[in-house]
Amino acid sequence: MEGKRLRDSYRQQSYVVRIFHPRGQYPRIKIMQPNALFWADDEVVFSVIHSVPWRVHDEDAPYTEMDWLAPDEIQFLGSIFLSERRNDARIRFYPVYGYGPRIAQKTLDLSKQSVAERIRDSIWIRLAHAPWGNHGKELNECRTHRYSLLDPKLLNLDRQPMYWAGVSTRDYVMLRGISSLFKADMLSSYYEFFEEAIVSAFIALEASFRLIVRKLEGEGIRNAGARDAAQWLFKHFDEPMGLPRPTIERYFEEFYDQRVMTLHPASRFGDNPYAPVSHDDYYHLRSSLREIFAYLAAGSHGPDFHEDVQRLGRR
């Protein structure tokens, strides 16, 4: 798709192709649904999603010059991402930034094997003739570098449809939280940007807190706050594991001071010349928040959570 048709496609619903870079880590799967496709094999990883641009999805959405994933893309890719198991293999989406060609078709059934294979072959040919422009180097690497693919048995992919249904494209806080974890994973690919990965995880932490507060208020708790969110977290995650009630009183209280000092060079904690963070902060937040978002989306824990409860109960 080129010229005016391409420009028009950015202002309406269309089939958006995303190529994923070998810097990421992906499940070796083919998820084919009528309006969404994810394909990962040894040679290429890509998605095709019948997607609506943000400004079409919501004309009141704030202006941004950042070319990032559309709401339908975050919803679909998020449903795969949330399918991770506790303390197991980690998915790391790494889309080629700013590159999202459109398919010149009004309607496609992406659940058909023949359609998916035809798209896959077209992408492979396109990668072979990638221009050396803004994306040429990365697209060439997608063809020449080796992908890191995960055994799908390490994931709860049978829950992917449940997560897809549970993440609404109108739930901007959930979308922001999930996409912030995507960004945190991308940044963590570079040692020098690990601090920024933690900052992105802090954004996801704030999103999870707001989602829990809204859930509690929807259940009748007036003016729910950090203490209520901490009790909710203990009740749904720690107590079933037989863990003692924590001494901290606020939601993820152990990160509160760090977050303030990281985001505010001067605060009531004094002047901070650098962020007081560690690599473990990222790994802890990444694991915990993914599981919290998954629970909020599905309304239940995955089988791996119950396996851990039983295992701890037998000790």
Listing of model-derived features with the role each one plays in the protein:
Residues 199-250:
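Flexible secondary-structure boundary motifs
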Residues 139, 245-310:
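Charge-enriched, short contiguous segments at helix-coil
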